From Swiss-Prot:
Superkingdom of source: Bacteria
Source organism: Cytophaga hutchinsonii (strain ATCC 33406 / DSM 1761 / CIP 103989 / NBRC 15051 / NCIMB 9469 / D465)
MF-aspect GO terms: 4 iron, 4 sulfur cluster binding; metal ion binding; N6-isopentenyladenosine methylthiotransferase activity
Residue intervals of the TRAM domain: 416-479
Subcellular location: Cytoplasm
Family: Belongs to the methylthiotransferase family. MiaB subfamily.
Subunit-structure text: Monomer.
Chief location category: cytoplasm
Gene: miaB
Domain Radical SAM core: 178-413
Protein name: tRNA-2-methylthio-N(6)-dimethylallyladenosine synthase
Ranges where the MTTase N-terminal domain occurs: 38-154
GO cellular component: cytosol
Record's keyword terms, sorted: 4Fe-4S, Cytoplasm, Iron, Iron-sulfur, Metal-binding, S-adenosyl-L-methionine, Transferase, tRNA processing
Length: 481
């Protein structure tokens, strides 16, 4: 699962250096001042699951006497919710920690802590060797934060990176990071059992466990009651969601959960992320087709287009299997279904011919957009232990550039095909480029920009698409008389 930064007139799959820096910006806490004694500041990096976790942390700590601030200098507690998926993500956090260590010189009582995947992976280095944090807290230990903060207040370092087989935070009502009141993340499961050879997630987030379906539906109903118009169901692999009620015959798989959420309110848009190609079922696809409010968009990471490389990655499917899934999606949901992907360039021992297989798979699938990176070896993973990271860096970068070029063209063609059509858009807010324009997305997850007129966020509007760039649609609201 990768970070999505809205309102950028760029293609997420293919950023320039400046654009990529913008896409990697963290989400930070907003100002909330209710007169409480202490201030909390959180920076959240990486995937949507991290953003969702930060909302859980905010909820826990606001119950313990914290307001939130958007300014680190004003904070009593600074928390970085971190990502370990790539080395540069970790380096970015390290630079921020050094900066916050400087702030502590002027405010010695300030607590600096690391949450999330880096906490689990680098606890000893961060606490004992580099001495740049006061507290290290893993993804399953957020309930313990009040105790850990008290420990630091008492003059000690604090750590809890215990991985749970049960924790889902099902009973905690998240405090939303985004104040737009339109879209919200709803976590439905935690952890991952897939054990891809390149990935640290199973080691930093633990094994899969699914959240109580009733608590998910209660959270969705509360969001609707509070005026939210869109939810995104989150998990490292949502299609493997399986929950059963203890002592009863009730069993709920992902397709059934998706249907239950769709039935909460026909005006509530429902998205989900991320899907593993081996687990997305025809039942899920037919459920999407059945309900108009389930968005016609699927994030289906391919990672590579070559079967040998996929086997080395332990993805448990072949090129042909992935292509069959794409064909089935098109058969059931039509060519209007938006499909996006993740791709790794230059994985261990990848040949030029195997790289060409990835390019041809992209052409076959015709992805709307994607997130693509060069392979970054992560210590402790099976790939790091058993495979040589032997593709030269300049070759990785050249292959990434070729992947980006193909994706830019595919995305532009998809957007050009929308010109002249009328799209139902959910308004998410004012465009960052012009206060006179609004921004919003269609069911296919395409961003559109259009003149504001008398409309505002949270409304659905019909927009006639009149133009596009590689990453954005442009249009005019069609008003019915």
């Amino acid at each position: 699962m990768k970070q999505v930064v809205q309102d950028l007139d760029v293609l997420p799959a293919a950023p320039t250096a400046a654009e990529k820096a913008a896409c990697d910006l963290p989400r930070i806490t907003e100002e909330r001042n209710t007169g409480k004694q202490r201030k909390l500041y959180i920076e959240s990096y990486g995937c949507q699951m991290n953003f969702s976790d930060s909302e859980i942390v905010m909820s826990i700590l606001t119950e313990e006497g914290f307001d939130t601030t958007s300014t680190p200098n004003n904070a009593d507690v600074i928390l970085l919710n971190t990502c370990s998926i790539r080395d540069n993500a970790e380096q970015k956090v390290r630079h921020r920690l050094v900066h916050f260590k400087g702030l502590k010189r002027n405010k010695p009582s300030m607590i600096v802590g690391v949450l999330g995947c880096m906490a689990e992976r680098l606890k000893a280095q961060l606490l004992e060797e580099e001495k740049i944090v006061d507290m290290v807290v893993g993804p399953d230990a957020y309930r313990d934060l009040p105790n850990l903060i008290n420990e630091v207040d008492s003059g000690h370092k604090a750590v809890n990176v215990f991985l749970s087989r049960e924790e889902t935070y099902a009973d905690i009502n998240p405090l939303r990071l985004s104040g737009d009141g339109v879209s919200a993340f709803v976590s439905i499961m935690r952890g991952c059992d897939n054990m891809c050879s390149f990935c640290v997630v199973p080691y930093t987030r633990g094994r899969e466990r699914s959240r109580d379906a009733h608590s998910i539906l209660n959270e969705v109903r509360e969001l609707v009651a509070n005026g939210y118009k869109e939810v995104t169901l989150l998990g490292q692999n949502v299609d493997s969601y399986k929950w059963s009620a203890e002592g009863t015959d009730e069993r709920v798989n992902f397709a059934q959960l998706l249907e239950r959420v769709a039935l909460v309110d026909p005006d509530l848009r429902v998205r989900f992320s991320t899907s593993h190609p081996k687990d997305i079922t025809d039942e899920v696809l037919y459920t999407m087709k059945k309900y108009d409010n389930i968005c016609n968009s699927i994030h289906l990471p391919a990672q590579s287009g070559n079967t040998r490389i996929l086997e080395l990655m332990n993805r448990t499917y072949t090129r042909e299997w992935y292509m069959e899934r794409i064909t089935k999606i098109r058969q059931i949901l039509g060519d209007d279904c938006g499909i996006s992907s993740d791709t790794i360039a230059g994985f261990c021992s990848e040949t030029e011919e195997e790289h060409q297989d990835t390019l041809s798979l992209m052409e076959f699938a015709r992805f709307d957009f994607g997130y693509q990176f060069v392979y970054s070896e992560r210590p402790g993973t099976p790939a790091a232990k058993k495979l040589a990271d032997d593709v030269p860096e300049d070759v990785k970068q050249r292959r990434l550039s070729e992947i980006i070029t193909v994706q830019r063209q595919l995305s532009l063609e998809h957007n050009q095909a929308q010109i002249g059509t009328i799209q139902k858009i959910l308004i998410e807010g004012v465009s960052k480029k012009s206060e006179h324009d609004l921004k919003g997305r269609n069911s296919r997850n395409m961003m559109a920009i259009f003149p504001k007129k008398n409309y505002s966020k949270g409304q659905y509007v019909d927009v006639l698409i009149t133009g596009c760039s590689g990453g954005t649609l442009f249009g005019e609201i069609v008003e019915t008389v």
